[in-house]
From Swiss-Prot:
Disulfide bonds: none annotated. Gene3D superfamilies: SecB-like (3.10.420.10). This is Protein-export protein SecB. GO terms for cellular component: cytoplasm.
Amino acid sequence: MSDAQQPVFNIEKLYVKDLSVEVPNAPAVYLEREAPQMEVNMSTESRALNEDMYHSSITVTVTAKLGDKTMFLVECTQAGIFRIQNVPQDQMPMVLGIGCPNIVFPYLRETVSDVVIRAGFPPLLLNPVNFEAIFVQQQQAQQQQAGAAQTH
């Protein structure tokens, strides 16, 4: 393989695309001593920007509740722009579904932890995410849906 045909994977830009924090029950919520229940919802998205530039993002929503009272709500979308060249087309879904999110996630985790601290709460560290397992599950679900659509 010549240098011109070598696979290229470069991070062009990592950035916070969207960030919001709400503390709807402040200041009373700061008097609470119990640990809140945490609910974390996460999604990923990838798309082509042009022939060799791709955008990948992870959106997370973290809701901390004590009973029916919301202590805080954080929504964050961390994104990256990647230059990807000379990667076989059949491998692109894996690069976009596993490789890019694995690079973006640590930055998302840091941003969420920082904003929770700035909102006056103890640090929140998001648990590591196995993007490979999520990718495999999504592929299996798509294959099952395709199989079900063909039988109807």
